[in-house]
Amino acid sequence: MKLKNEIEYVFRILNYLSLQDKNRIVTSAEIAENENIPHLFSIRVLKKMEKKGLLKIFKGANGGYKLNREPKDITLRDAVETIEEEIIIKDRSCVAGQTSCSIIFGALEKVENNFLKNLEKVNFKELTCPHVPLEIEDEIK
């Protein structure tokens, strides 16, 4: 599985803003330069992040962006769902009587649930504090 560039940019923008003073307003140009994101693309992603409630936009000469929530309240799942409305591995449409299909999709459902739980467990406060161990499950249950 390969993440879209847009999702990676959301991760990088959230990480950058999480490291700033919570009252500091940061311009899109600063974010783009420091995170090596094409400026016009960063503006598009920032708008999606604001629409999802992750950022506040400040207009005008001294305008820019800052987090709308504390970094501890923003998870990797929030970030991914800024771009991907729904995170699913595969639609589960099996024809009646296909035993192998239902077994496969049952396993995929477990993988998907584990993946979503792990995305919800990791927040941007933890990601900006490298000495804090992440609570991620390694096993599929």
Q: What kind of feature is each model-predicted range?
A:
Residues G53:
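Glycine-centered, phosphate/nucleic-acid-interacting loop/turn motifs that mediate DNA/RNA or nucleotide
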Residues P71-A96, E112-N113:
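Conserved segment of winged-helix/HTH DNA-binding domains
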Residues V95-K141:
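C-terminal regulatory/oligomerization modules of transcriptional regulators
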Residues N5, Y9-F11, N15-I37, K56, ...:
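N-terminal helix-turn-helix DNA-binding core of bacterial DNA-binding proteins
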